[in-house]
Amino acid sequence: MNILPSGLDFVLEAPCSTWRENLSLRRRTSVPIIWDELALYEEDILQIASEDGAEGIGLKISKNGGLTKCRRQRDICVAAGYTMSVQDTTGSDIAFAAIVHLGQTLPKKYLRCILDCRDMVDVKTADGDFDVVNGFLSAPKTFGLGVTPRLDVLGEPILSYKN
């Protein structure tokens, strides 16, 4: 790793399977390390920050406990100065909408990327327009997540809320 040229736009995402291995590698290389699968809870991110264990975190909405928990994790990462990838392990149009919304709440200097997970599945679950302007993705400006669920695919709602 240390023979890579300095300044190379390259990171190691989840390079090792254990905490100990990641921390050991972090101390032996100047290549930035992004944690994801081992950073699922607030406590994990706090521990990584306290040990100077990374340059960034991959926030996976479903694995990390949903949008509310990811918001708190995002705040910890911003306080630690970490770059973040906002993603999910797999996705749908609805999951993608949530990813985009969370990604938009990050200060741009901390946003590494937003993963477009829509191509990971064959079934389209919702419709919505997502614009890319100057390299940045933006969510629809309509209510909620900004997408219209395809009820012919998902079935009728079990419960709905109205104003």
Question: Predicted segment positions?
Answer:
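Active-site microenvironment of metallo-dependent hydrolases
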Residues: 154-163
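Non-cysteine beta-strand/loop elements that form the S-adenosyl-L-methionine
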Residues: 14
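Alpha/beta enzyme core
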Residues: 1-11
